[in-house]
Amino acid sequence: MIKHILVPTDGSSMATLAIHYAVAWARHYEATLHGIHVVDVKLLEGPFLQDISASLGTAPYINYQGNIAMLLEERGRTALEAFEKACAEANIPCDVTLTTGLVARSIVEKSPLMDLIVLGRGGEHNQWLDGLLGSTTEAVVRRTDRPVLVTGRDTPGAGRFVAAYDGSQHARNALHV
């Protein structure tokens, strides 16, 4: 039975749609939703900041890392507030986690406590994916052993869904969701 649903959110339109799906599933199964936003450590410690510093002609990390971390955390809080608002409007119990790390890894590390993960097909760069899965979505699907519902552009509850089945034990387990 589905009692705990993990919903990663970056505040994008696809994440918002995933929240709507998760709310519908939580309502049906009387489940608790667990929202998570991960501040991508690669944006704080990787070449991104060095490139900005070089473009501006300043030494890297002097003030930028702290300022960018604050901005990214604020963006995460905003995304999680929207998640909490959607849950409150639907009278669905929820909790939220704001963390910093590698995005897919952080989601997968939280997944063993969950019965289902619901996430959007793509995130903030979705318009450039040309129908492909976003890198975070693909990494989560490949790495977790939990069932994953990847949402598209349709309205929740709008119709059928597709389940891939190859006869393996993992596929049989997935059908029990």
Model feature map: region roles:
Residues 15, 19-21, 27, 96, ...:
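Gly/Ser-rich helix-loop-strand patches that form or flank binding pockets
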Residues 1, 14, 40-43, 66-117:
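Structural beta-alpha unit
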Residues 9, 63-66, 70, 74, ...:
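Charge-dense, low-complexity intrinsically disordered segments
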Residues 71, 132, 166-170:
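Alpha-helix N-cap and loop-to-helix initiation/capping positions
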Residues 74, 78, 135, 173:
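Conserved active-site and cofactor/substrate-binding residues in soluble primary-metabolism enzymes
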Residues 52-57, 77-79, 108-110, 146-148:
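Short hydrophobic/aromatic-rich motifs at helix boundaries and adjacent loops
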Residues 1-63, 90-92, 156-177:
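Small/aliphatic-rich secondary-structure junction motif
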